[in-house]
Amino acid sequence: MSNPVTITEAAALHIKDMMKEHEEENAFLRVGVKGGGCSGLSYGMGFEHEKSESDSVFDQHGITVLVDKESLDIMNGTVIDYKQSMLGGGFTIDNPNAIASCGCGSSFRTATNAGKPEEC
């Protein structure tokens, strides 16, 4: 079975730099989805030191990634990348399950999950 989420090499390098900067080299990277935003769902990404029995756990480019059970179907097939431009850099999230997103780009919905929309 392939990993539900792909972390590109560029994203992994930036994540490793962030882990080192924040002295989190031994942490896991948790990615997930929560209700919120004007389209109903928003992404979350952060460092954690404990994993749950229900987490999907996999390694990408030397980073141990955790995805909670509730986020797994929504994020299946997602690619997390890091892009650099003249205006700066940032993570991009390409989720093939997202069918609509808000104008500001901070939230989305899928065909099977409308999430919990909030006012912008």
Curated annotation (Swiss-Prot):
GO terms for biological process: iron-sulfur cluster assembly. GO terms for molecular function: 2 iron, 2 sulfur cluster binding. PROSITE patterns: HESB. Gene3D superfamilies: HesB-like domain. Disulfide bonds: none annotated. One of its GO terms (cellular component) is cytoplasm. It holds the Pfam family Fe-S_biosyn. It comes from the Bacteria. Disruption phenotype: Not essential for growth on minimal medium. Belongs to the HesB/IscA family. This is Uncharacterized protein SufA. The lineage of its organism: Bacteria, Bacillati, Bacillota, Bacilli, Bacillales. The gene is sufA.
